[in-house]
Amino acid sequence: MAFNFNWSPLMADAGFYTRAQDLLTTALNKSPKPPIIVDDIVVTELNLGSIPPELEILEIGDLAEDRFRGIFKMSYSGDAFLTLKTRVQANPLNTYLITRPAYASPKPLAAASGLTIPLQITLSNFRLSGFVILVFSKQKGITVVFRNDPLESLKVSSTFDSIPSVRDYLQREIEGQLRILFMDELPAIIHRLSLRLWVPEYRGLDAEARESPAASASGPGEDPLLSPPKDPVDASGNLLSSADIASLSLDSGVEMHSLFSQKNLLRLAALTNSQRTLSLFTPSIREVVFRAWTGCADQGEGAASGVVSPGSPVLSRTHSHISSPLSSLQDASSVLSLQNRSTTPGSSFSGYGLSLGAGRHSKTRPTRKRKKRVVDLRKHNKPADAESVSADSTFTESTTPPTVFSSSVIQEEANDDPVTPPMSPETTMRIPNRQHRFSTSEDKGKLRASVAQQLTYTQPSHSTLHAQRANHCPMIPLSADGAKTSSQQQPISHGSYLAPREKSHEASSAYESNANRSITDAVPNSSILEQAWMMKMANEIARRIQEGKFAANNNYPGAWEQARARTPPPAYGQ
């Protein structure tokens, strides 16, 4: 179904074109303009022509005397035209610099000066085609919505038609702006026009809106000099007196200074400087990055000294390692001893200076005590046996004083991973104090001999075992000459003492336990102190028997044969 428009009422109303021009001018300046346009776009002439658009009704949703809703197919190729005036920038370099940030600009001087030229554009020969949703109501006006882009083509005539590049550029830009106008702004313009035509309430509001700007422009302006601030200052920040304020006037030819309060100026200055500090009152400004600066005094001290203050935290690379419980305790004790020793002013930097200048791949690390496992495989029945374990001392080649500790019995699990013994001697050696043990008095030697006789009398089976061991490996004498004799023996290879290691430990442990049991059975009525002393002597005799066995096959004379003959940790025995 089709019908004809009565286009004459729109042509007869002269006020319609005036209102349409104002609405089009507002709509064209509302959207962001291209940078080449440096002035407002003003609609100077508007004519809808004598040819109405063609409408084809596709659907009617609601039909009554005062309302209508339907979907149309519109096509227009009439003689309507529109004339616009504005000013454009003729220097393309100026336009380029406006659209680029300041840090990326080459900053030309005279070449970047602007050159504005007035421009008049006439739009004609419109070709429109699209689907329109039309809703009419006398109370709500006319609502027109385009479901697609209706603009097909138009003709643009301007002042720069003689320049092809400028003509093509204007053609593209204006077509883009008109497409936005038809889809977004034109429905709102038609709705406001319909409200002014059919709704009396909006007509009265429109009249009041036109009268209010004229009344405000004709009325007297507000004089800021009537109520000056309490502490007025001029543009340079100097305080103004009441006489200076009285001499100022709005109509005077002298340059008018803005009167600001001193407090406001201080706040503005603090606001400007807050973007370069770590102030908590820095305002949150969008798309702004604040640069944090340190104080000049802090920078001067850091540059002069060149050494980081120990009070400040130091970021250093941390290396993790896996250690046994014994080594962890030793490391903790060494750290505590280092902290205790660093109380003097001369050594206050010892714990901190180790991490100074440590880079990402630096090789300088704090000296750490080498892990040394001291394992005692002998079995003890009473806590009093632990006194006999502190026989050796540990000497560590380090910058710190040597730490002497008594090793305790530690049960370690066998490690399945093969461990290669070190090729070079370690810095930490266990040196048995044989000289101290061999320098005992003759009275103690006689007393030990009496204890041995008691053991022989109490346990004849053990004395037989003692005699058999003496035949194979002679005993070490208890005098100082025995130490000299043992030091003249020849060394043997490492493989010679690895084979009978387990058997010797089993035999010594069995003999020690039997000796302890025999002493306990022999003197049941003696005091606790005598029993403890006798058990200590029995342990000493058992240890001497074991040392004598090793000394029989030892070919390494000197003070290091016992260190070589000692049983290594379980990892070396696998």
Swiss-Prot record:
GO biological process: mitochondrial genome maintenance; mitochondrion-endoplasmic reticulum membrane tethering; phospholipid transport
Listed Polar residues bias regions: 335-345, 484-493
Biased composition (Low complexity): 212-224, 302-314, 323-334, 346-359, 393-403
Regions of compositional bias (Basic residues) in chain numbering: 360-373
Membrane topology: Multi-pass membrane protein
Entry GO CC: ERMES complex
One Gene Ontology MF term: lipid binding
Tagged with keyword Glycoprotein: no
Domain SMP-LTD stretches: 1-195
CDD domains (alphabetical): SMP_Mdm34 (cd21673)
Keywords assigned: Lipid transport, Lipid-binding, Membrane, Mitochondrion, Mitochondrion outer membrane, Transmembrane, Transmembrane beta strand, Transport
Record localization: Mitochondrion outer membrane
PANTHER family (UniProt xref): MITOCHONDRIAL DISTRIBUTION AND MORPHOLOGY PROTEIN 34
Family in the record: Belongs to the MDM34 family.
Name of the featured protein: Mitochondrial distribution and morphology protein 34
Lineage: Eukaryota, Fungi, Dikarya, Ascomycota, Pezizomycotina
